Every structure is written in structure tokens, then in C-alpha cells.
Amino acid sequence: MHQSKEERVHRVFEKISAHYDRMNSVISFRRHLKWREDVMRRMNVQKGKRALDVCCGTADWAIALAEAVGPEGEVYGLDFSENMLKVGEQKVKARGLGNVKLIHGNAMQLPFPDNSFDYVTIGFGLRNVPDYMTVLKEMHRVTKPGGMTVCLETSQPTLFGFRQLYYFYFRFIMPLFGKLLAKSYEEYSWLQESAREFPGRDELAEMFREAGFVDVEVKPYTFGVAAMHLGYKR
């Protein structure tokens, strides 16, 4: 039976939720932590503000945002995988954070009014949605005027030689890690497919502009295997 992209992605994340954090560290050689630290530094999140992390998964970025805005601020994390949210809830509870709420929802139809958040983020989630532009426009809609939306995502390396090595690693090695460490070869095969098909830096920057963002900034990481895109709402 043919599955839609949304159905397939949901099945993938429901299955790998218990191993997701560990596998992220293995696959990226823990570089994803440094990438997000740099993005947070560039965002310069202010105390008392409101933030939304779309496709929050196990809530790492939502937690970082909650710590940054402080107890006077408010953070929502949204994901469509109940199992990923359960892992995230455990992490939020362990840190004693009372200013972050994790909710089950769909990035294609964010359950928030227009102009709700000072910061809207999505980390390693945009490549998994059915329609990139729909989600970017939804993120733009709920961002306050003057606020920012930030995407941290895999990208397409441009350095010759390294690009070929990257594609080999993602296509053949990463699924093996999934099989050995998480018993999930098929699921990690999907993740490499979604990364391979995702737009490059320039194309995604143009999509940000088409969605309504201005002053779009792009920062590549580790020879372009990942990139930050940051845009503001007028």
C-alpha cells in the first residue's frame, strides 16, 4: 500500500523515538549540538519573550529556548509524533522547566493566532514535512512583526570531493548505524533520502523570501552539511 510522505515520516519517528537523541549524536559526530549553540548565539534570545519550536521532536531546542527566555518567558514545542513528545516531556520534567509546553500538532497548520511569537524555530524537521513552503508560510504567519524565524537543517555540500563523501556516508553508512544501534535500517534509509532531496542553501534562502521573510541570513556548517537560515518578519 502506498504511503503519503506524512504517513511515512510519522511511522519513522514513532519507531525511532527511543533512540533518536543517541543516533543524532552518532550520525553527526555530535556536531549538531555545536551547530545549535552557534544558532542560539546568533539569535540572541531575550528574556521574557515567547518562542515556538516547530517539529520539536524530543524537545532539545525547545528546552534551550525555555532556558534562554527565562521563567518570565514562554515556549511551545509542537510535533506530530506522540512518542517523540513523550521523550521530550521526560526531559522537560527532569529539568524542572515550567515555562515550556509540548503539544501534539501539525506543522502544516499551526494551532496559533497570527503574530504570536517573537522567535519561531525548526531544527532538522523542515525536510520531513509534506510541503516546505506551506510550513514556512505558517511559521511566518505566527511570527510577530519584528520577530525572527530560524531553520537549522541538513544542506547540500558544495565542496567537490567532500560532497561525494557526504552522499556516500548518508546513503550507505548512516542506515547501517541505524540497523546496528537502533534496529531501524529502513527508517534511517528514509532520513538519508529526505536529506538528499532537500533544497540547497541558496534555494532555501529564496524560499524564505517567497514566504515573506526579509533580511535573510544564511550560515553553513561543517563544509555545508548543515545550514542555518534566519529571516525576519516586517
From Swiss-Prot:
For biological process, the GO terms are: menaquinone biosynthetic process; methylation
- Provide the alphabetized UniProt keywords: Menaquinone biosynthesis, Methyltransferase, S-adenosyl-L-methionine, Transferase
Which transformation does this protein catalyse, written as a reaction?
A: a 2-demethylmenaquinol + S-adenosyl-L-methionine = a menaquinol + S-adenosyl-L-homocysteine + H(+)
Q: Name one GO molecular function term.
A: demethylmenaquinone methyltransferase activity
User: Source organism's superkingdom?
Assistant: Bacteria
Any Pfam family matching the protein: Ubie_methyltran
Q: How is this protein named in the record?
A: Demethylmenaquinone methyltransferase
- Organism of provenance: Geobacillus kaustophilus (strain HTA426)
State which gene encodes it.
Answer: menG
